Amino acid sequence: MPGNSFGQLFKITTFGESHGPSLGAVVDGCPAGLELTEADLQEALDRRKPGQNRYTTARREADQVKILSGVFEGVTTGTSIGLLIENTDQRSQDYSDIKDTFRPGHADYTYQHKYGVRDYRGGGRSSARETAMRVAAGAIADKLLRQQGIQVQAALTQMGDVVASNIDWQQVRENELFCGDANAVEAMQELIRQLKKEGDSIGAKIRVQATGVPPGWGEPVFDRLDADLAKALMSINAVKAVSVGDGFEVVSQRGSEHRDEMTPDGFLSNHAGGVLGGISSGQPIFADIALKPTSSIAISGRTIDRWGNEQAIVTKGRHDPCVGIRAVPIVEAMTSLVLADHWLRQRAHNLTAQTETPDISR
């Protein structure tokens, strides 16, 4: 099964299934000399882990990460960093009744066609449980980026019809929904309570931004910074759309409005989202991500079994009524992984590049 690795110079490979004994990751390319402890990674994992509040899945996992290699006396050695998280709260019996039945909207049907065999327990490899390792690896990337003055942060900006009118980043850090609008938080909480009563789910939208990225990062033409960012974000479970900058709003914009005019004192706008020609402009990089509502709900639906017979299905188990909540730290992690990779690529390929053009983004 290829497709389990991401990145070129800062590269991660993950392994493990939702109901297997453990999840793991190998991080290659981290420079030597970075101070790193399990506590650094745990802080990020605690923001993502299940069972933390009444608005997410009831599955409770400690998500205690272990650093197996690549760190000696609290400092990275430049060798591969091995990470491991043990699964401790599996309830595989929740899926025994549907082991031969395909859950609509999930990867059951497509995995069966691709491999001829699948782990039916919680989706196996296709489960969002895998993203715990992305968050752990992303925490390493984030620490590297912060040393360069770069900050990556994300927020829940929409849940169903409830839209946040603004993003107060301090507010994002203080509430369990990662939403930056206190008024929207209350409406979202009420929506989740209603969804739980109905046994249904809802979609969401997330905004991610990176500040402090200097001009020049990105590798045209196929490894454009925004292309790699879009791929990274689209690889997250349930993500169905990614837009960079003004995204789909550019359809109704005119060139005179959309172009980000420049003056000696800086850019006059940032419709491009901090990327021009696939290369960072030095302005804040931002993107929006749309996530579908989970199909694991308590409402009966139509499907088929592995032999093609029609079946009715009600998904048991413990699931998030809105996957967008716990996706926020995952979005941050994937963004950090992309930026760390492009930071190393810029150093490797263009370290001696010089220009007389001033950096007007500062």
Swiss-Prot record:
Lineage per the UniProt record: Bacteria, Pseudomonadati, Pseudomonadota, Gammaproteobacteria, Alteromonadales
Ligand binding (NADP(+)): R48, R54
Molecular function per GO: chorismate synthase activity; FMN binding
EC number: 4.2.3.5
Names of the cofactor(s): FMNH2
Subunit field text: Homotetramer.
GO cellular component, one term: cytosol
Note accompanying the cofactor annotation: Reduced FMN (FMNH(2)).
Organism: Idiomarina loihiensis (strain ATCC BAA-735 / DSM 15497 / L2-TR)
Full protein name: Chorismate synthase
UniProt xrefs under Gene3D superfamilies: Chorismate synthase AroC
HAMAP family per the UniProt record, alphabetical: Chorismate_synth
